[in-house]
Amino acid sequence: MNGRKRTFLLITIPILALFFCFNTLPLIKGVIYSFTNFRGYGEFDWVGIRNYTDLFTDARVGKSYLFTFKLAIVATIVVNVLSLVLALGLNSKIKFKSALRGMYFVPNILGALVVGYIFNYFFTYILPTVVKMMGGKGDSILASSKWAWVAIVIVCAWQSVAMNTIIYISGLQTVPEDVYEAGSLDGATGWKKFKNLTFPLILPFFTINMVLCMKNFLMVFDQIMALTKGGPAQSTESISYLIYNNGMSGGQFGFQSGNAVIFF
């Protein structure tokens, strides 16, 4: 064995071992537990595919899937619309462009739980007080089973817009100026310019952002943990939160392992 191959193995094997221990092995154990009635502690029995069949008849599980996909779709649309508008503005010829880009990226580097608890205080105390001063009821949006999900969308969008904006700016900077010059000769301005020239050329970046947003929002957990903890009346219970809450403290480790396998 030559020195180059030995070095390659010395670098690769520890990484693969760590990946197997902290990623692959828990995945395998989760799949195994999904065929049991394991409660997270003590003994357990094999139940076959009963956990999987019960998942399709459990109303709470179905409700969490509907909520998660609704949240993911709405948040993905909101984030991409806002990100694209911001990217177009920050890519134009304006003063302090670099400083503004840095400022808009700040939310992305903050912890999701920290942001969630800050917005929790805002929605619970500050916003109701302002609404009361304006003559409204002043009820917290987080206490409404009808509107609490909107607060989660707002927090998710506020924190996610930054990264998507950067990706869109990267896409806009790949568009040659010659294209715009040729388009202006043909009378393309404003909306026509964006629709016929800009958007088709940044379509790959749009696709990337849509996929990343959908993936991230389908796994939403931190914001729900900080804002609503799945309430009120389980109206904002995402799949990830349901798996965590009922699996860890609800004695449904095996059942929720099956849920996690299906969701995976």
Question: What positions do the PLM features span?
Answer:
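A structural signal for multi-pass alpha-helical bundles of membrane permease subunits
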Residues: 3-264
